[in-house]
Amino acid sequence: MDSLENQFLIAMPSLNDTFFERSLIYICEHNEKGAMGIMINRPSGIIVDELLQQMELAEEPQPVTSLGREVLVGGPVNPERGFVLHTNQDCWSNSDPITDSLMLTTSQDILSCLGSDKAPDKFLIALGYAGWTRGQLEQEIADNSWLSVPATVELLFDIEHEERWQLAAESLGFDIWQLSNLAGHA
């Protein structure tokens, strides 16, 4: 299977009553060792400003650019660890480029700049991530748990959280609710 890096994983409707029900995951890394992604459509209930104040990184008052933005639940793995997915800006101590225009940063130095003129143009913050061991994601796709589509910056950063799964599914060109997770064999 080709790498799914820089793709969205769309949870099939059959994944109901699971952690990943109606989830949309941005795949940050996918190789022979496994895969890692950030769920981008489940708000945690924590506002970015509150997180920065709890970490004593916020200056008062917080600039309007981050006001109201929510921290996301990135996935069930390491939920205490923060990830910042952002447009390219190479000045943080622990940033990994994903594409020419997107990076994933795990260092705290980026947080102190959010809301200032030093912040990336577009960003989202997530706690935790979704991870798969070698071959696990490929098997889940074969089991019809996930569909994939190319990621877009617009869907990552500009669309409301609650609309992301449906809009990603609509980009496939058919009604996801009409799909069955059962596969036939001839």
Swiss-Prot record:
What Gene3D superfamilies does its record include?
Answer: VC0467-like (3.40.1740.10)
Q: What's a Pfam family this protein contains? A: DUF179
Q: What SUPFAM superfamilies does the record tag this protein with?
A: VC0467-like
Q: Which InterPro entries match?
A: AlgH-like
One Gene Ontology cellular component term attached to this UniProt record is: cytosol
NCBIfam families per record: PRK00228.1-1
Family affiliation: Belongs to the UPF0301 (AlgH) family.
Protein name (Swiss-Prot/TrEMBL) = UPF0301 protein swp_3600
What is the native source organism of this protein? Shewanella piezotolerans (strain WP3 / JCM 13877)
- Could you read off the lineage of the organism from its UniProt record? Bacteria, Pseudomonadati, Pseudomonadota, Gammaproteobacteria, Alteromonadales
